[in-house]
Amino acid sequence: MKKNKANKNTSGNIAQNKKARHDYFLEDKFEAGLELQGWEIKSIRAGKVNITDAYIIIQNAEAYLVGCRISPLNQASTHVVAAPERARKLLLKKREIDRLMGARDRQGYSIVATSMYWKKCWVKLEIHLAKGKHAHDKRDTLKDKDWQRQKERMMKHSV
């Protein structure tokens, strides 16, 4: 018989970076795998991950996730030194890395992490090419959101 593992979070989103949608115009989307250690997987299953300030750097034709915090569990292995904010290598194809590098260097884009999720048994990271917003752009998007809410409210009450 198959045992149910109710405490494991193996479906859907692990973490989201909602701040990225507010601070950047998100354009091209990529899916990347992560090179993780055993204690990091255990912490991710427990939900102890934060990607709010995460971004991607490219060095020596390899992409790394920087600013992602994975807090170690208390039961984690004692013989491994846990570094919660270490740079984690992203698993991308060569042409994807080349495209990211070109856009970052020539057009002034940033590369930000927007979502971390499970895909089957693998942890995947959704990254976007992004262009920074100015203060007036942020205000405009907030005004548009408020207007959309008001329209929905008016339509709901008028019916």
Swiss-Prot record:
Primary subcellular site in the record, as a coarse category = cytoplasm
> Could you tell me which Pfam families the record lists for this protein?
SmpB
Give the start-end ranges of region Disordered: 138-159
Query: Mind listing the UniProt keywords for this protein, alphabetically?
Result: Cytoplasm, RNA-binding
Tell me its family: Belongs to the SmpB family.
What is the role of the protein in this entry?
A: Required for rescue of stalled ribosomes mediated by trans-translation. Binds to transfer-messenger RNA (tmRNA), required for stable association of tmRNA with ribosomes. tmRNA and SmpB together mimic tRNA shape, replacing the anticodon stem-loop with SmpB. tmRNA is encoded by the ssrA gene; the 2 termini fold to resemble tRNA(Ala) and it encodes a 'tag peptide', a short internal open reading frame. During trans-translation Ala-aminoacylated tmRNA acts like a tRNA, entering the A-site of stalled ribosomes, displacing the stalled mRNA.
Spell out the protein name for this chain.
Answer: SsrA-binding protein
